[in-house]
């Protein structure tokens, strides 16, 4: 079967945004205009096509990123048909992992901002993630019909707060309730969308006289930005004072793909104005898979290799999301980087080192699907029938093995105990948690050996709320939830030498292991380091890995209060052995004893996770917000001015003090403040708090 759409006409894009910027409504309009979704779903009715999990519909926020394939011929049917694969990404801070995951597999992104609230703390997080993966992007300033909407102010914020060179290619005509349409600053025409057919058709009109001067000035800025793409264009621009429409578009496209500029559009998705032009901009300015550098990976010989976006290259794809579907079981969403994959064929999972067979391949629309015979370079689709895959695995041609870049997932910071309400729920809970953990690498499940409770850990309270909620809805498991626990850690602050000696003579063959260890604090974040400094074979070589293992096991179990130990450098420098009685077990125990003894003498401290917190609040609640953060042992690091009397407070606060913060902040500010929180670092817990925790654990 030949390729139906040439790869140059593919656009793999994400739509990213802050929680309330109107991203889901924007995606809905995209589906509507691309002719796939005939009734526009509104988020406030809980009926949007991409928000297909029930909780999303209830909470009105997007949680799982669904991949949707659409086709677009242009607002004026001016293009040959392009295939646009859209990955919907969540904007809530507890789900930044989903955003990271989708940015990995995209070639470009549309970032949606709210016309009145502009750049919010969460938008900065998303923007930094897009910078990290060097994703070319366009900006859509939405909600231009809202009170306080101001396109130019948001553009200015993007320049100052996000440090991007933002080039508007549109100007709004009117704002708030007078918002009627936009000016296309490249064509220098006003666009008037037809309200009778929900904006499916439009007319070009002359620019309103009151905006002519402003539009001319912005057109000039845009042409200058285009001219900077190359010396030839710059020379032409300086000589003739202008460039052709075609030259402008090509140059802006090139600079967007190089991440030098960010083009800005505006509109109101809700009022059916603007999204049509965003789709045109996606086609004109965002890259096709062949316009971005080929993905790199590591082959069997540990050599770096590239996989170009080409059907003739060996097959390679990345599994970027696992979802459980009530009808077909597990769906593995994959981005195909190179080659062709036919349904029913075998693939190799190079991360797990296992062969698997793909049952069926389906292309997802927001909530229905078409079956495909094959997928090719550039495609995004879902595979059915894969058993062993987890998020971030590479699937490749068994004869050309490669591991594409691994995704790095953050460590969870909050843990709660869950117990099934009845015996019947017990077995179902295990299966449910296993499936949910395969879908979401930032969520962990473990059993506490002492209390034999099941513990689940995640990125925040909302994250775990939703997991518990999904267990109830999707798997019918009712469970009781314990109080949240913080993931404390331990470390040492001094260097010591310590002896670990394990001798057991009780008739028959004895046990003998003896080591001397030097324990030193390692740099923050450097983790555990083991150095073998044995000379002259005083500890035989075959027992050294056992010593290392014993130390690591003891580190996992902690020395003060049973929390894992971080950032320690251990040197094995001396010891002795017995010809007959020494074995691996004895040296493992000796290593563990030596570490515990040493760590207790090396000024051990308890570490608590500290979060970077940003609160956006109206100025009149500022005092209350700061006072409350101080009460929570927060360290105020600074304040910025937002627009319209809004203040942004930056603070570092211990996680243990942040439980229930969302509710407290809402009631203190009558729901007008919002906050974002992400893990920053581990810091020493104050003595009184450490003492209380150690006593409660002993």
Swiss-Prot record:
GTP binds at residues 17-24, 88-92, 142-145. Residues 8-290 form the tr-type G domain. GO terms for cellular component: cytoplasm. The keyword Protease does not apply. Keywords: Cytoplasm, Elongation factor, GTP-binding, Nucleotide-binding, Protein biosynthesis. SUPFAM superfamilies: EF-G C-terminal domain-like, P-loop containing nucleoside triphosphate hydrolases, Ribosomal protein S5 domain 2-like, Translation proteins. The keyword Manganese does not apply. Its main location: cytoplasm. It is found in: Cytoplasm. One of its GO terms (molecular function) is guanosine tetraphosphate binding. GO terms for biological process: ribosome disassembly. Catalyzes the GTP-dependent ribosomal translocation step during translation elongation. During this step, the ribosome changes from the pre-translocational (PRE) to the post-translocational (POST) state as the newly formed A-site-bound peptidyl-tRNA and P-site-bound deacylated tRNA move to the P and E sites, respectively. Catalyzes the coordinated movement of the two tRNA molecules, the mRNA and conformational changes in the ribosome. Belongs to the TRAFAC class translation factor GTPase superfamily. Classic translation factor GTPase family. EF-G/EF-2 subfamily. This is Elongation factor G 1. It comes from Shewanella sp. (strain MR-4). The gene is fusA1.
């Amino acid at each position: 079967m030949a390729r139906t759409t040439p790869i140059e006409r593919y656009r793999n894009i994400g739509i990213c945004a802050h929680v309330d910027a109107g991203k889901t409504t924007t995606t809905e309009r995209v589906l509507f205009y691309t002719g796939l979704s005939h009734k526009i779903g509104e988020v406030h009715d809980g009926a949007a096509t991409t928000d297909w999990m029930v909780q999303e519909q209830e909470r009105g926020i997007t949680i799982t990123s669904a991949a949707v394939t659409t086709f677009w011929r242009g607002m004026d049917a001016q293009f040959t048909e392009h295939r646009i694969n859209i990955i919907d990404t969540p904007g809530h801070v507890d789900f930044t992992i989903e955003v990271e995951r989708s940015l990995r597999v995209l070639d470009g992104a549309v970032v949606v901002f709210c016309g009145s609230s502009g750049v919010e703390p969460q938008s900065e997080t998303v923007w930094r993630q897009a910078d990290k993966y060097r994703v070319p992007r366009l900006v859509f300033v939405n909600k231009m019909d809202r009170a306080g909407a101001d396109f130019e102010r948001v553009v200015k914020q993007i320049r100052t707060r996000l440090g991007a060179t933002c080039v508007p290619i549109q100007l709004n005509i009117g704002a708030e309730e007078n918002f009627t349409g936009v000016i296309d600053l490249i064509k220098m025409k006003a666009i008037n969308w037809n309200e009778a057919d929900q904006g499916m058709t439009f007319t070009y009109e002359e620019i309103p006289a009151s905006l002519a001067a402003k539009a001319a000035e912005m057109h000039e800025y845009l042409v200058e930005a285009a001219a900077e793409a190359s010396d030839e264009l710059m020379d032409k621009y300086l000589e003739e004072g202008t460039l052709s429409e075609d030259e402008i578009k090509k140059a802006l496209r090139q600079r967007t793909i190089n991440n030098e500029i960010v083009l800005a559009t505006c509109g109101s998705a809700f009022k059916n104005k603007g999204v049509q032009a965003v789709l045109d901009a996606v086609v004109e300015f965002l890259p096709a898979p062949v316009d971005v550098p080929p993905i790199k990976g590591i082959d069997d010989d540990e050599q770096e290799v590239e996989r170009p976006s080409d059907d003739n290259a060996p097959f390679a794809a990345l599994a970027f999301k696992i979802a459980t579907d009530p009808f077909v079981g597990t769906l593995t969403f994959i981005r195909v980087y190179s080659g062709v994959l036919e349904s029913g064929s075998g693939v190799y999972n190079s991360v797990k080192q296992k062969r698997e067979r793909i049952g069926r391949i389906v292309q997802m629309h927001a909530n229905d699907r078409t079956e495909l015979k094959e997928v090719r370079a550039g495609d995004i689709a879902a595979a059915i029938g894969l058993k062993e895959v987890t998020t971030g695995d590479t699937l490749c041609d068994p004869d050309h093995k490669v591991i594409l870049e691994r995704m790095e997932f953050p460590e969870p910071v909050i843990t709660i105990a869950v117990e099934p309400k009845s015996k019947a729920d017990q077995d179902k809970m295990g299966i449910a948690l296993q499936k949910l953990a395969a879908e979401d690498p930032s969520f962990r499940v473990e059993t506490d050996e002492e209390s034999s409770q099941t513990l689940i850990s995640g990125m925040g309270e909302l994250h775990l709320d939703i997991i518990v909620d999904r267990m109830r809805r999707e798997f019918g498991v009712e469970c009781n939830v314990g109080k949240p626990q913080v993931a404390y850690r331990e470390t040492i602050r001094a260097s010591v030498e310590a002896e670990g000696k394990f001798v057991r003579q009780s008739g028959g063959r004895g046990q003998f292991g003896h080591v001397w260890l030097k324990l030193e604090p390692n740099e923050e974040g450097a983790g555990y380091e083991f150095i073998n400094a044995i000379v002259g074979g005083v500890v035989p070589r075959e027992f050294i890995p056992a010593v290392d293992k014993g130390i690591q096991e003891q580190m996992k179990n902690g020395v003060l209060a049973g929390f894992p130990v971080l950032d320690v450098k251990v040197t094995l420098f001396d010891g002795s052995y017995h010809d007959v009685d020494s074995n691996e077990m004895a040296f493992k125990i000796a290593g563990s004893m030596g570490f515990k003894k040493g760590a207790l003498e090396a000024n051990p401290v308890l570490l608590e996770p500290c979060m970077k917190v940003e609160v956006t609040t109206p100025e009149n609640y500022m005092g209350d917000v700061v006072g409350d953060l101080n009460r929570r042992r927060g360290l105020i690091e600074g304040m910025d001015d937002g627009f319209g009397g809004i203040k942004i407070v930056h603070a570092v606060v211990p996680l243990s003090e942040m439980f229930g913060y969302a509710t407290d902040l809402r009631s203190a500010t009558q729901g007008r403040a919002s906050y974002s929180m992400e893990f920053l670092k581990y810091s020493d817990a104050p003595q009184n708090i450490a003492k209380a925790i150690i006593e409660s654990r002993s």
